[in-house]
């Protein structure tokens, strides 16, 4: 009886989603021109070919704290950290695991965590699991961030007065430590725009806040040899922690949290998404190593990708009333308001052989539904022109 009741409940919620045009479903791969994947540099196919020459066990057989750790992984972590100008790093099984592990265990009770309103769902989930007091600031709005930081200082002062009085009355020492954290993405996954990173770093220093930057969509695209936006701006020593993921431009799977040795040791001890999971298999780590070999190669270049991004933007501005979100990243978004309308336009593009997907509410705010178009090194100008031939009709 209870099983039937829960099934009825699930069905009612799903039906409600369908009626609101919010229902999600899985699709298999297709032979359309790829404007959808995060494989910006086409590494997934290159690495696939390289890894065919290696033979590894099918699984790690345990967590990194038990049977799943190897010198190969630790050497790889240090190699990646050196490449990005960090002291060290810790590999997680996915970008989601990395953000959840980092943000859930670092900010503590009475700490303040301030996040951009458009951070990735994994950062939101990690923040929700922390004991910190959480605030959002308006997307990429420096004034809004400073307002939150200044109010955080006022809140801290009030708490300190209360705790000082309490500890004085109880004749105990004051041991509470207050920290402020800012969590952002360097390139935002649903808009493709870049964080105002230099200004945010300046504010973090002014207010003594620890900055956490997710570089998922900047790695491989910005900075020398794809080191990321933090490195491009020379801010490596100004950021408390960086999350670099391997599942986007690197064409692999997994992620690494970059920072100090103390941060790494702390995560090994307290990040539950690291501690309580089987380590990724060795062939996953080998593919990551191969990706970094490609990045470090003297032949590496992402100039064609940036040319195609520029070409796309040039074509977009020629269509009157086309609302393009400002972005110089590989993620280009065209606003098509309304879930049904956005899906309809995406279907027209797919019917002409172009794999372009609609991003609809609630993933993005209502009225800001969009076509999310990803540029790749392997795309062509002719393929881009086909997009705008459809949009002009």
Please annotate each region the language model reported.
Residues 249-314, 321-325:
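PLP-dependent aminotransferase class I/II
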Residues 102-121:
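Conserved PLP-anchoring active-site segment centered on the Schiff-base-forming lysine
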Residues 2-59, 209:
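N-terminal "arm"/small-domain region of PLP-dependent enzymes with the aminotransferase-like
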Residues 135, 139-213:
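Active-site phosphate-binding strand-loop segment of PLP-dependent enzymes
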Residues 225, 231-266:
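Active-site PLP attachment segment
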Residues 46-47, 82, 351-352, 363-393:
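PLP-dependent enzyme catalytic core of the Aspartate aminotransferase-like
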Residues 57-95, 117:
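Conserved N-terminal alpha-helix of the aminotransferase class I/II PLP-enzyme fold
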Residues 42, 304-310, 319-353, 363, ...:
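Conserved PLP-binding catalytic core of the aspartate aminotransferase-like
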